[in-house]
Swiss-Prot record:
Induction: Repressed by sulfate or cysteine. One of its GO terms (biological process) is cellular response to sulfate starvation. Transmembrane segments: none annotated. InterPro entries: Flavoprotein-like_sf, FMN_Rdtase-like_dom, NAD(P)H-dep_FMN_reductase, NADPH-dep_FMN_reduc_SsuE. It catalyses: FMNH2 + NADP(+) = FMN + NADPH + 2 H(+). One of its GO terms (cellular component) is FMN reductase complex. Keywords: Flavoprotein, FMN, NADP, Oxidoreductase. This is FMN reductase (NADPH). Homodimer. It is an enzyme of class 1 (oxidoreductase). It comes from the Bacteria.
Length: 191
């Protein structure tokens, strides 16, 4: 099982990247291959000038194609997810998330930014044809106690992250279940 984690903050370390660090640790403990990407892996010029042939973008797209899921984390600024993340998502092929389970994670100054994930980020993930976009986790700044060292969260946030990661894990495994095609079943019923 392969998962890509994508840190959408233009800064590192950041509160949103600490959520990803926690997720990576949990998934690594479950023998999941985790490939981590952050915006610093891409030359700013490649993102700003839409260089679709950038080596980093090609590698990222190839790894994403082979992945089962994506966990994307972003800070919320002015009621929207990171503009730097948007520039990267705009460069991905139209069906880049086809067949993928996606878990969005976001941080913001206050809970007033909570809906930015649902109304700004999720539509873009959907446009990239994600198979399943999970509810995700939003954390306000007060819930991320330490992000400069080992991530530390309030108990409430830790519980929500654990629940979201469990849901992500279950969704990844649902992808493996082979369900017969409905049309072929109808054909057999009339035979």
């Amino acid at each position: 099982m392969r998962v890509i984690t994508l840190a959408g903050s233009p800064r590192f370390p950041s509160r949103s990247s600490s959520l990803l660090e926690y997720a990576r640790e949990k998934l690594n403990g479950l023998d999941v291959e985790v490939y981590h990407w952050n915006l610093q892996n891409f030359a700013p010029e490649d993102l700003l000038y839409a260089r679709f042939d950038s080596p980093a973008l090609k590698t990222f797209t190839e790894q994403l194609q082979q992945a089962d899921g994506l966990i994307v984390a972003t800070p919320v600024y002015k009621a929207a997810y990171s503009g730097a993340l948007k520039t990267l998502l705009d460069l991905l092929p139209e069906r880049a998330l086809q067949g993928k389970v996606v878990l969005p994670l976001a941080t913001g100054g206050t809970v007033a930014h909570l809906l930015a994930v649902d109304y700004a980020l999720k539509p873009v993930l959907s446009a990239l044809k994600a198979q399943e976009i999970l509810h995700g986790v939003f954390a306000d700044d007060s819930q991320v106690i330490d992000y400069h060292h080992r991530p530390q969260f309030t108990p409430n946030l830790q519980t929500r992250l654990d629940t979201a990661l469990e849901t992500f894990w279950q969704a990844l495994h649902r992808r493996d279940v082979q369900v017969p095609d409905l049309l072929s079943l109808r054909g057999n019923a009339h035979a």
